[in-house]
From Swiss-Prot:
Its EC number is 2.5.1.18. GO terms for molecular function: enzyme binding; glutathione binding; glutathione transferase activity; protein homodimerization activity. The keyword Phosphoprotein applies. Signal peptide: none annotated. GO terms for cellular component: cytoplasm; cytosol; intercellular bridge. The modification Phosphoserine is found at residue 210. The gene is GSTM1. It catalyses: RX + glutathione = an S-substituted glutathione + a halide anion + H(+); prostaglandin A2 + glutathione = prostaglandin A2-S-(R)-glutathione; prostaglandin J2 + glutathione = prostaglandin J2-S-(R)-glutathione; prostaglandin J2 + glutathione = prostaglandin J2-S-(S)-glutathione. This is Glutathione S-transferase Mu 1. Gene3D superfamilies: 1.20.1050.10, Glutaredoxin. Changing residue 116 to F: Slight increase of catalytic activity. Liver (at protein level).
Amino acid sequence: MPMILGYWDIRGLAHAIRLLLEYTDSSYEEKKYTMGDAPDYDRSQWLNEKFKLGLDFPNLPYLIDGAHKITQSNAILCYIARKHNLCGETEEEKIRVDILENQTMDNHMQLGMICYNPEFEKLKPKYLEELPEKLKLYSEFLGKRPWFAGNKITFVDFLVYDVLDLHRIFEPKCLDAFPNLKDFISRFEGLEKISAYMKSSRFLPRPVFSKMAVWGNK
């Protein structure tokens, strides 16, 4: 039985999950929900099913794998990663994984907060002003390692890739001062399974956010 990944028909919080499912050659199907247009942004496609799936904390995204029913995007990533030993091996690697799992969510949410804000155009300049310092921390944390936890890829590389790629879409030149981050992106996109997925009709890089967002809704 293939796993079922449920989410809106956008990139959003499912991008890293989809990438990890593809990288691990997992058998899965997607259940994509469509949100209505403005002004109502009808969510009935999801709400009609929300409490009928046996989820403990009903939300999107969700992953159903037989008896295992999981919500929360990072919990889903961890579940898939544990199956494939992609959580780090040494204590040092696991610490780095734990830090990045949370740091990437912070940065994802920070971008989301301004992109959904009606005052987006006013907030954007300050966000861009502060962005290099945020990216510098990632650059220094990666250093000369091939992957963020160490010599082997882990699930947080999928999260970091998502955050860096989002910011590359937001401001195309934002990574120019950080060659090791650009190299990391090239390395990640060069992975055989990832490269094949990005060329397939299943790949969904946009819309980044839902129809309610001011930026990234197309």
